[in-house]
Amino acid sequence: MSKDKLWGGRFTQPTDAFVEEFTASIQFDKRLYHQDIRGSIAHARMLGKQGIIPQADVEAIVEGLQQILLQIEEGSFDFSISLEDIHMNIESRLSARIGEAGKRLHTGRSRNDQVALDIRLYLRDEIVEITSYIDLLIDALLTQAEENVDVVMPGFTHLQTAQPILFAHHMLAYVEMFKRDSGRMEDCLKRVNVLPLGAGALAGTTFPIDRDYVAEQLGFPAITRNSLDSVSDRDFALEFISASSILMMHLSRLSEELILWSTSQFKFIELSDGFCTGSSIMPQKKNPDVPELVRGKTGRVYGNLMALLTVMKSLPLAYNKDMQEDKEPLFDTIDTVKGSLKVFSDMIREMSIYPEAMGRAAGQGFSTATDVADYLVRKGVAFRDAHEAVGKAVAYCVENEMELTDLTLTEWELFSPRFEQDIFEAITVDACIDARNVPGGTAREQVKGEIARCRKGK
């Protein structure tokens, strides 16, 4: 049994040693040390400003906390499981260092609003960093688009050849996805960036604190408006993991395409050696481990979202010990997203493109069939009739092992008398691409304009 029990005045028995270890969170919440100290310094200064504790105590507290911060960053601070969490590890060391003044730090504050503050401070910084990583990935995608703006490739639906597009257009599709991810992170930040400190355990405090002062000190534009909600709320963490799940889904989709494109069957791209591994038995192998692992880690983030949703789903107000389980899913999501984004932006930047293979594939699989139908529509044929005629032409080509470009005018006329000599110009891959000159389309003019617009941050 543990000899000393935290806040043990009400108890007659010490905490069981295994229970002490089981309930401790210091193993994972110690990463909040910087935010905990920063929040405590702001709280102490507010207590002094309001005359709640002597100014001399404030100075001792601030100096003591700064020394503890230095110790932690130097690696000389010994974290104790018996002190349960980062809050008590720091407060206990502070009291041991400066004496009675350290015991006054927690005046007007509960661990409930303290931990809510720490998590918000931590997540706020991480969202800013994650958004910067998204920007780097967008830049890498735009660079590939710029450098390969004339490269054509097949576009797919159902993973079957559909219509020819520009490779740059495909890259821009992911730019749009990641721009939305960035927007979701920025929107989430608005709800993270609210000060909960001052809510106390659940009902506020009897001391004349100044929450707005603390908010200003810590860079929060607003304070929470209900003490119960302040300590019960983990919506902001759920929202972040939800946004992260969508972000990882986009990375997973791109991963899947890079894996396919790098196969010998496609050979559209090649990933740099630094992002691939070999085989323990097959000497020829170059395995795309990085996109495969990111694809796998996507499920991990989904699991974190489900874990935290399940923790929160039946909790009565206000704080419950269940909520200690919020940190590991949150921290793991942050680490996974940051790592995935960082490795992806570098991998995309170093990726090699094979225009010849893409170009050959773009003209195969009857990719210009839609344009043949559109050609007939311009000649006065109803679209459904045009669709039927071109379908028959495709069937003819399949039966005779031909492509549409192999047909003679006489053969075209078998399917519609409206076909003329200009059909041959209308169904080249380049003509089909440039014909889609509408906003959002794959025409070169549109794609180049979109790249320029993205570069301007629009």
From Swiss-Prot:
It catalyses: 2-(N(omega)-L-arginino)succinate = fumarate + L-arginine. SUPFAM superfamilies: L-aspartase-like. Keywords: Amino-acid biosynthesis, Arginine biosynthesis, Cytoplasm, Lyase. Belongs to the lyase 1 family. Argininosuccinate lyase subfamily. It is found in: Cytoplasm. The keyword Amino-acid biosynthesis applies. It is an enzyme of class 4 (lyase). Pathway: Amino-acid biosynthesis; L-arginine biosynthesis; L-arginine from L-ornithine and carbamoyl phosphate: step 3/3. NCBIfam families: argH. InterPro entries: Arg_succ_lyase_C, Argininosuccinate_lyase, Fumarase/histidase_N, Fumarate_lyase_CS, Fumarate_lyase_fam, Fumarate_lyase_N, L-Aspartase-like. Transmembrane segments: none annotated. GO terms for cellular component: cytosol. GO terms for biological process: arginine biosynthetic process via ornithine; L-arginine biosynthetic process. One of its GO terms (molecular function) is argininosuccinate lyase activity. It holds the Pfam family ASL_C2. This is Argininosuccinate lyase. It comes from Pelobacter propionicus (strain DSM 2379 / NBRC 103807 / OttBd1).
